[in-house]
Amino acid sequence: MEKTLETVPLERKKREKEQFRKLFIGGLSFETTEESLRNYYEQWGKLTDCVVMRDPASKRSRGFGFVTFSSMAEVDAAMAARPHSIDGRVVEPKRAVAREESGKPGAHVTVKKLFVGGIKEDTEEHHLRDYFEEYGKIDTIEIITDRQSGKKRGFGFVTFDDHDPVDKIVLQKYHTINGHNAEVRKALSRQEMQEVQSSRSGRGGNFGFGDSRGGGGNFGPGPGSNFRGGSDGYGSGRGFGDGYNGYGGGPGGGNFGGSPGYGGGRGGYGGGGPGYGNQGGGYGGGYDNYGGGNYGSGNYNDFGNYNQQPSNYGPMKSGNFGGSRNMGGPYGGGNYGPGGSGGSGGYGGRSRY
């Protein structure tokens, strides 16, 4: 059937609805099958899909999978019941990242701090609290103001006691707070940005999924620290990050889709200079090291100007990173494997799974 202008938005809407109901399950035992995975997660609701990702050649488990529930409420119930243990192993469930978002920097990083842009002068802390507390327990709320004038800079941060509210909020994308459209992103610290930058060269460190070599996390069957790969890791080929966790990179580079660094350029996470973006500057800088990258050097998606002083904390930048080669099939097929699109590695290679 030929796709029309009318069917494309309908398909996208259907896919987005499914995305809200899907969980990524990392750290699976190699003994875990679709049947045992399904049996475990059906305690929270009806599953419409369940898959353990396997190497297309050897059929060996890659140590992760996906489950899709019939409703978002069931997903919430499952996430509220963490930790999860399947076949004697504690696993890590996370809300699955949409295919079109998976190549963006920070998409797979687990954080508890949310960046909120588009904050107007009439928006106060209680507006943010009233809106976001339905997603989870809030630890702190910060609306950033100019030190001299006291005026709002148009953005702030909401910190939760868990990463799942942040994952859920950014997955939904569109939010209206106090009558104004808001932009929400994961907020990454300077340290987190630098850790991702260093991933392209395979230098030390831990991104929260395991130790450096030979131990810790278990997100892939490879001998080299599991989650970041080895010879048979998360994305096949060189693994999920090849020595660190560059999310699919080749030997020390290549990362999210084959460009040098995490999204092209020289500096990894957005290329170029320190911080997030391609130039210096900062996202509303001068406030306890918040900002970083080139946020604020111009309008931010029509939400206003966020000033240009240098600083160190900022949102996950949007835009396409890693070449934008569309991943085939419901579980990808490109930007998770070595070099980018459609390879035999990837989040499923060329096949459906």
Swiss-Prot record:
Biological process annotations from GO: DNA geometric change; miRNA transport; mRNA export from nucleus; mRNA processing; mRNA splicing, via spliceosome; mRNA transport; positive regulation of telomere maintenance via telomere lengthening; primary miRNA processing
Name of one Pfam family that matches: HnRNPA1_LC
Recorded consequence of changing residue 321 to S: Impairs hydrogel-binding
Modified residues (N-acetylmethionine): 1
Gene behind this protein: HNRNPA2B1
Sequence positions bearing N6,N6-dimethyllysine: 104
Disease cited in the entry: Inclusion body myopathy with early-onset Paget disease with or without frontotemporal dementia 2: An autosomal dominant disease characterized by disabling muscle weakness clinically resembling to limb girdle muscular dystrophy, osteolytic bone lesions consistent with Paget disease, and premature frontotemporal dementia. Clinical features show incomplete penetrance.
Post-translational modification Phosphoserine, affected residues: 29, 85, 149, 189, 201, 212, 225, 231, 236, 259, 324, 341, 344
Variant or mutagenesis effect after changing residue 269 to S: Does not affect hydrogel-binding
Omega-N-methylarginine: residues bearing it: 38, 203, 213, 228, 238, 266, 325, 350
Example of a GO cellular component annotation carried by this entry: nucleoplasm
Subcellular location per the Swiss-Prot or TrEMBL entry: Nucleus; Nucleus, Nucleoplasm; Cytoplasm; Cytoplasmic granule
Organism placement in taxonomy: Eukaryota, Metazoa, Chordata, Craniata, Vertebrata
GO molecular function: DNA polymerase binding; G-rich strand telomeric DNA binding; identical protein binding; miRNA binding; molecular condensate scaffold activity; mRNA 3'-UTR binding; N6-methyladenosine-containing RNA reader activity; RNA binding
SUPFAM superfamilies assigned to the protein according to its UniProt record, in alphabetical order: RNA-binding domain, RBD
Keywords, alphabetical: Acetylation, Cytoplasm, Disease variant, Host-virus interaction, Isopeptide bond, Methylation, mRNA processing, mRNA splicing, mRNA transport, Nucleus, Phosphoprotein, Repeat, Ribonucleoprotein, RNA-binding, Secreted, Spliceosome, Transport, Ubl conjugation
Modified residues (Dimethylated arginine): 203, 213
Superkingdom of this protein's organism: Eukaryota
Comment on protein domains: The disordered region, when incubated at high concentration, is able to polymerize into labile, amyloid-like fibers and form cross-beta polymerization structures, probably driving the formation of hydrogels. In contrast to irreversible, pathogenic amyloids, the fibers polymerized from low complexity (LC) regions disassemble upon dilution. A number of evidence suggests that formation of cross-beta structures by LC regions mediate the formation of RNA granules, liquid-like droplets, and hydrogels.
Subunit structure, as described in the record: Homodimer; dimerization is required for nucleocytoplasmic translocation. Identified in the spliceosome C complex. Identified in a IGF2BP1-dependent mRNP granule complex containing untranslated mRNAs. Interacts with IGF2BP1. Interacts with C9orf72. Interacts with DGCR8. Interacts with TARDBP. Interacts with CKAP5. Interacts with TBK1. Interacts with STING1. Interacts with SRC. Interacts with PPIA/CYPA. Interacts (via C-terminus) with FAM76B; the interaction results in retention of HNRNPA2B1 in the nucleus and inhibition of the NF-kappa-B-mediated inflammatory pathway.
Positions bearing the Glycyl lysine isopeptide (Lys-Gly) (interchain with G-Cter in SUMO2) cross-link: 22, 104, 112, 120, 137, 152, 168, 173, 186
Name of this protein: Heterogeneous nuclear ribonucleoproteins A2/B1
Record's compositionally biased regions (Gly residues): 202-223, 320-353
Species the sequence originates in: Homo sapiens
Role summary: Heterogeneous nuclear ribonucleoprotein (hnRNP) that associates with nascent pre-mRNAs, packaging them into hnRNP particles. The hnRNP particle arrangement on nascent hnRNA is non-random and sequence-dependent and serves to condense and stabilize the transcripts and minimize tangling and knotting. Packaging plays a role in various processes such as transcription, pre-mRNA processing, RNA nuclear export, subcellular location, mRNA translation and stability of mature mRNAs. Forms hnRNP particles with at least 20 other different hnRNP and heterogeneous nuclear RNA in the nucleus.
